[in-house]
């Protein structure tokens, strides 16, 4: 099974910059998960051939939002995590299949000065609780923009960014707790020591050209699936957003 996750930072903007349908066709992934779609119902007429499409919209216009394109029709689709205060921003879609749950997640940014860190920690706790409930039923593949660089190897300038949003002790510890609860960062499972592998670059100062980036987009899978991971990769050559797609090949 081939899965792709991409924070598009505005789907309409990406569709203006590239032939998005051709991209989907060329990649020929079984499942494609998008984050930060920034659209409302009816704003995009997009029905790729051979895919079932599911959208979760934020209440606030032009903000957040997720989508999943799946070749196989799921047994059920769950929008959000069942906690009203966390389900206003369209951040989670879960697809249930016979042998696995597939989730797309767009984790809230803690913002400059960590002004939203308290909410972020509440989100982390609620999300992990939800994931663990799913994992008791069948294994989970979670992907998306998790807005955290877990270790120093996961960003270009760790010392300069210590305790900035995305590299605070609280956020990194929350991700550690997630993994310790029985999950695997697929990219580090395959490439434990690979440096310079990033999925997001600031638009400022030519950061992408100089590869001054962060790895904040992930595929995280249940521990029981780790031996079925065949490859995990980052498609840094795909333009259109400040993030690039990340990919997982897994034997399901």
From Swiss-Prot:
The record marks 243 as: Interaction with DNA substrate. The record marks 147 as: Transition state stabilizer. The active site is at residues 106, 145. It is found in: Cytoplasm. Probably binds two magnesium or manganese ions per subunit. Keywords: Cytoplasm, Exonuclease, Hydrolase, Magnesium, Metal-binding, Nuclease. The keyword Ribosomal protein does not apply. One of its GO terms (cellular component) is cytoplasm. Mg(2+) 1 binds at residues 36, 242. Gene3D superfamilies: Endonuclease/exonuclease/phosphatase. Its EC number is 3.1.11.2. Its cofactor is Mg(2+); Mn(2+). It comes from the Bacteria. InterPro entries: AP_endonuc_1, AP_endonuclease_F1_BS, AP_endonuclease_F1_CS, Endo/exonu/phosph_ase_sf, Endo/exonuclease/phosphatase. It is an enzyme of class 3 (hydrolase). Mg(2+) 2 binds at residues 145, 147. Belongs to the DNA repair enzymes AP/ExoA family. This is Exodeoxyribonuclease. It comes from Bacillus subtilis (strain 168).
